[in-house]
């Protein structure tokens, strides 16, 4: 659809990272956009760099698998204000592939009836992730004649 927009493919944001796993996963209740709570386990953290800027994110896990919600510094402008989601892939050697080119907007970006986990504060980045899905175009104001 014309309404979905993506940043150009960015090979530098397709990462393979070492995750510092927590000795015992902590369950945290993640608030959702509809006021519910969904439980996730805090699985581990990883460090990475974007254009030389250090950053760190937490990977969460539930019965559906691994989950990486994040908010970058473009949120509310080029990227969706409530953040984007990613499913990190565990590799055979125990590292994880984190490909920000696959970052997507939560369903609640398109329909407020969906219940979407709200990105925890620990996954709010002070730098831009120019990869993956951009803001949903339908939310933009139409151009003025």
What is each stretch, according to the model?
Residues 89-96:
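A short, structured loop/turn motif at beta-sheet edges
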Residues 79-80:
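Short beta-strand and strand-turn-strand segments in soluble, beta-rich domains
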Residues 1-63, 71-74, 83-87, 112, ...:
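A compositional/structural signature for long, glycine/proline-rich flexible linkers
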Residues 102:
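Short beta-strand-plus-loop segments that form exposed binding edges in beta-rich domains
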Residues 105-107:
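Short acidic/polar inter-strand loop motif in beta-rich domains
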């Amino acid at each position: 659809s014309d309404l979905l927009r993506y940043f150009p493919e960015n090979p530098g944001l397709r990462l393979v990272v070492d995750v510092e796993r927590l000795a015992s996963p902590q369950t945290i209740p993640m608030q959702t956009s509809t006021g519910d709570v969904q439980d996730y386990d805090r699985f581990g953290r990883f460090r990475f760099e974007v254009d030389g800027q250090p950053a760190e994110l937490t990977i969460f896990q539930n019965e559906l698998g691994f989950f990486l919600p994040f908010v970058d510094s473009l949120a509310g402008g080029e990227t969706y204000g409530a953040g984007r989601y990613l499913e990190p892939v565990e590799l055979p050697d125990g590292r994880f592939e984190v490909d920000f080119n696959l970052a997507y907007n939560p369903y609640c970006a398109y329909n407020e009836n969906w219940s979407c986990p709200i990105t925890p504060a620990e996954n709010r980045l002070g730098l831009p992730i120019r990869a993956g899905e951009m803001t949903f175009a339908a939310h933009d104001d139409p151009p003025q004649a």
